[in-house]
C-alpha cells in the first residue's frame, strides 16, 4: 500500500509502516470516554477507498459511527453496503450519502439496520464480493466472545465478505479496558491469519494537523479534550488521542502457504 510492489511483498521481517495525515475537515467528531473514539475521517475514508478499491468496487462499512466512509464511497463511484444498530444513525448515513445524488448513485447505497448479533446475516448477500471491508476494534466495540484459546473474536465473518484480492481494514489503537492498558494489535493479527488473511501493512492515521513537524494537540478532534479529562489508569500517562492504528489485511487468491505464521516482527512480540 506504499512503496514499490517488491517492497510490499518481499519476505522481510518487518512490515512497512506508513503515516497518513487524516485531520478532519472542520467537522465535530463524537466524544467518548477512555480514548475509545477512533473515527474514520473524510480524508481517511478517501485514502482507504482510492488505495484499496477501483471504480464500481464494493465497500462494506460495519457499524459506522457516521456517514464519512459511505458518503465518500458514493462520491468516488463505488458501491457501498453498511449495517448499523441505531435507526437514527442509519437515517443520517442514508441522507448524507444520497442527498443531491441521482437515482443511479442511490442504487449504489445499501443501508441496513440489524442487531449486533445479526450483523453478518444482514450482509450475507455480499459474501465473496467486497473490495474493501472496514471494521472497528475499539474499547467500546471490543468483542464479548473469545475463541477457545482466549484470543479476540475471530475475523472470519468480515473476511468472508471479501473477494479474492480484497482488503480488510481494522481500525483500532491502544486504549484502556477496565482501567488497564490494552494493545489489541497482536490478537487481531492472529485472528485475521486464522481467517486466512495475509497481513499487509500498519497505517498510523494522524488526526491532528502537523506544524513544524509536530502534531498540534490543541487542534485535535473534540474527543481529545474529554479523554484528557478522564480519570486514567496509573499504568499509562494522561494522553490525547492523536492517531488511530489501521491494520490492513488482504484475502489471497490462493490460501497462504504458512497461515498462522506472522511475518510482522515486533508486532507479535
Language-model segments: residues:
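Class I S-adenosyl-L-methionine-dependent methyltransferase catalytic core
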Residues: 1-269
Amino acid at each position: 500500500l506504499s512503496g514499490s510492489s517488491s517492497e510490499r511483498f518481499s519476505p522481510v521481517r518487518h512490515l512497512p509502516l506508513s503515516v497518513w495525515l487524516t485531520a478532519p475537515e472542520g467537522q465535530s467528531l463524537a466524544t467518548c470516554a477512555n480514548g475509545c473514539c477512533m473515527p474514520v475521517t473524510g480524508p481517511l475514508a478517501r485514502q482507504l477507498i482510492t488505495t484499496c478499491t477501483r471504480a464500481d468496487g464494493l465497500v462494506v462499512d460495519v457499524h459506522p459511527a457516521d456517514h464519512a466512509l459511505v458518503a465518500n464511497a458514493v462520491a468516488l463511484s463505488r458501491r457501498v453496503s453498511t449495517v448499523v444498530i441505531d435507526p437514527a444513525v442509519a437515517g443520517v448515513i442514508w441522507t448524507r450519502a444520497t442527498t443531491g445524488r441521482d437515482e443511479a448513485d442511490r442504487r449504489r447505497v445499501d443501508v441496513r439496520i440489524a442487531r449486533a448479533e445479526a450483523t453478518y446475516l444482514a450482509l450475507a448477500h455480499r459474501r465473496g464480493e467486497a473490495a474493501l471491508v472496514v471494521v472497528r476494534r475499539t474499547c467500546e466495540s471490543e468483542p464479548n466472545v473469545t475463541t477457545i484459546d482466549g484470543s479476540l473474536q475471530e475475523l472470519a465473518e468480515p473476511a468472508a465478505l471479501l473477494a479474492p484480492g480484497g482488503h480488510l481494514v481494522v481500525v483500532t489503537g491502544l486504549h484502556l479496558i477496565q482501567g488497564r492498558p490494552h494493545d489489541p494489535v497482536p490478537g487481531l493479527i492472529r485472528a485475521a491469519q486464522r481467517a486466512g488473511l495475509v497481513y499487509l501493512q500498519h497505517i498510523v492515521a494522524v488526526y491532528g494537523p502537523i506544524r513544524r513537524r509536530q502534531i498540534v494537540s490543541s487542534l485535535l478532534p473534540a474527543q481529545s479534550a474529554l479523554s484528557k479529562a478522564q480519570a486514567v489508569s496509573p499504568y499509562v500517562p494522561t494522553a490525547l488521542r492523536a492517531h488511530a492504528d489501521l491494520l490492513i489485511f488482504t484475502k489471497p487468491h490462493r490460501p497462504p502457504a504458512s497461515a498462522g505464521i506472522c511475518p510482522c516482527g515486533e508486532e507479535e512480540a
